[in-house]
Amino acid sequence: MDASALERDAVQFARLAVQRDHEGRYSEAVFYYKEAAQALIYAEMAGSSLERIQEKINEYLERVQALHSAVQSKSTDPLKSKHQLDLERAHFLVTQAFDEDEKGNVEDAIELYTEAVELCLKTSSETADKTLQNKLKQLARQALDRAEALSEPLTKPFCKLKSANMKTKTPPVRTHFPLGPNPFVEKPQAFISPQSCDAQGQKYTAEEIEVLRTTSKINGVEYVPFMSVDLRERFAYPMPFCDRLGKLPLSPKQKTTFSKWVRPEDLTNNPTMIYTVSSFSIKQTIVSDCSFVASLAISAAYERRFNKKLITSIIYPQNKDGEPEYNPCGKYMVKLHLNGVPRKVIIDDQLPVDHKGELLCSYSNNKSELWVSLIEKAYMKVMGGYDFPGSNSNIDLHALTGWIPERIAMHSDSQTFSKDNSFRMLYQRFHKGDVLITASTGVMTEAEGEKWGLVPTHAYAVLDIREFKGLRFIQLKNPWSHLRWKGRYSENDVKNWTPELQKYLNFDPRTAQKIDNGIFWISWDDLCQYYDVVYLSWNPALFKESTCIHSTWDAKQGPVKDAYSLANNPQYKLEVQCPQGGAAVWVLLSRHITDKDDFANNREFITMVVYKTDGKKVYYPADPPPYIDGIRINSPHYLTKIKLTTPGTHTFTLVVSQYEKQNTIHYTVRVYSACSFTFSKIPSPYTLSKRINGKWSGQSAGGCGNFQETHKNNPIYQFHIDKTGPLLIELRGPRQYSVGFEVVAVSIMGDPGPHGFQRKSSGDYRCGFCYLELENIPAGIFNIIPSTFLPKQEGPFFLDFNSTVPIKTTQLQ
């Protein structure tokens, strides 16, 4: 953070606050006083040497408190008339026409200029306001002159050479989907594929195209991947834009007080997209999206602290400086990271209000500022409406930013948690700007929540992390913008606060008692005790290289549970070139979700398991033991971290796993690495397959070779193979039985060489599944005897042969 820049921000906000205060524009004054105070707080954190900085902070916050009553009592200015709004739309049409004009998009520019002229003339004929008529006619004249100037070269033969160099309107072309961040849209870092790639990034396989096409339809609406062509999206229209899909479904709580849908110009005289990006100004209402609002808050805080576009870069239209701007025509486009790629979401600006005219969605404390409400609306549209089932910040922040999600459970039996190591890591990474953080409470009784000032299963934004003389603190924001922690170091704690600590944390309990904005300090120990999960979102720019694969796992492939066999699980080879000093490789598994019910009742428990098997396929879950085992969680995102310390080539097998496979899933595996690597699906060398359906029944359930009298009664099959080649044999039986098989050579064609054998087995008997893989089996005739470990274990089985040459099979017994 730059202390000088923050000091300048504070001066600018204070000047605007005083100006609005003198003009009687109290709502805007309140907003800017708060922003001035926040800028000073951040400036002090960054090492500002300004004198009496805490006094100034208190002064601004006290003025905020004093103005609240004035805001309530002051009558609002009359809203703009329809004809004044038409003039604003005409101005926007001309502005957009001028942008197309500058780019040389002649036909687009002419169309927009013409529509502006028609709107000006129509409105001028409807209004009796002479001043307004003059403005409309003047604007119409300017637009008409430019439209005619552009049209003239297109109609004169002697200007054909000149006009040939001018761009004419071409239909936008949407090619294959981008695999990662679009190089035309954002420039954080180059995402270069270690696989085959072209000049613009990674190529798609036919399977990937089908996966992304299938999961483009979310809750019945298609959200296409965001492409460079979408930067030419049209936003200017003579009439207010209305989403063709209609209004969003409201939540039950909204319906109880809902009055109507309004546009920003129905609420304020001066709608603006963004006055200033601030986490302090964001307020959640009755939509159950606390994690989403917390995600907005920390994204805004990050953008403010590090002066890097994060949340403001996802909403369009934007001006030439890349700043989102208010559109009087009411159309907006938001880029969200959904189901493997950034996707395009179109919304109008209609928002729900109650009978008092108060918004029933999240909003900025500056009622003229729109970005909070519009980004929330875009996300709610994708999720099927404001009747949002709830989420977590990992999911929401990934959708908003594309940053890498990680989950730290503080009270989990399956995940170890180190309080000291976690704080040290969070402190260092937070202040470097590497990570966004939220914290969520777990289930608690109403009495517990009331006692501690906490909301059960609620997400809080982490705004700051500090350490002072061995004491460790986290600053949190409740998305409700009220209701704070009541335990140690709350504003009412008279025992633990010292003048020294207050100065270090820029916190005055007496001032805080005057206004509840939902922001508070809590000790790290108390957070670990009373909160349940910390959600992290990591900046992908930390990694030099990244690539991904989009794929599908069919529910019909393999057993419901993979506790005994991984033969049908998707598997990938990851080969990493680790430099001196070590490196980190992260693998993110993301399941695509296309239905609100699936989102609300996520029953798919996914994980990623890592094996050190040189990139070869793994068949048994515990043989060899996993290098990194996965915890199966019902979240759409699962992050695996591989830490390398030894220089050289490291090769891993990555296995996608589920707890109980109920449905076909579509997913993306994305690898982030600080060093070069290759990543690909493990190919099958086999081109032919044959299955035998058999059963152990009565006498033929003879058991293993330990039971000599009955073993000879087991089914016996014979197979003929004409050429030497690789062979994979798999036996699948009832899970409650341990199964195995033997292969016995009957006759070998020619010299078998080193690959000849008399007898081979599948090894130890295993529950429900076993296999034998031979790199080169000589041509010849072989018998195979499948059996259960114990006699009299009856049931069906499948015997699968996978090869590169035809195999003939017969049953001998």
UniProtKB/Swiss-Prot annotation:
The modification Phosphothreonine is found at T95. Residues 232-540 form the Calpain catalytic domain. Residues 702-813 are annotated as: Domain N. GO terms for cellular component: centrosome; cytosol; nucleus. Residues 541-701 are annotated as: Domain III. SUPFAM superfamilies: Calpain large subunit, middle domain (domain III), Cysteine proteinases, MIT domain. Its main location: nucleus. InterPro entries: Calpain_cysteine_protease, Calpain_domain_III, Calpain_III, Calpain_III_sf, MIT_dom, MIT_dom_sf, PalB/RIM13_Calpain-like, Papain-like_cys_pep_sf. It is found in: Nucleus. Its EC number is 3.4.22.-. It comes from the Eukaryota. The active site is at C290, H458, N478. The modification N-acetylmethionine is found at M1. GO terms for biological process: positive regulation of epithelial cell migration; proteolysis; self proteolysis. Calcium-regulated non-lysosomal thiol-protease. Belongs to the peptidase C2 family. This is Calpain-7. It comes from Mus musculus (Mouse). The lineage of its organism: Eukaryota, Metazoa, Chordata, Craniata, Vertebrata.
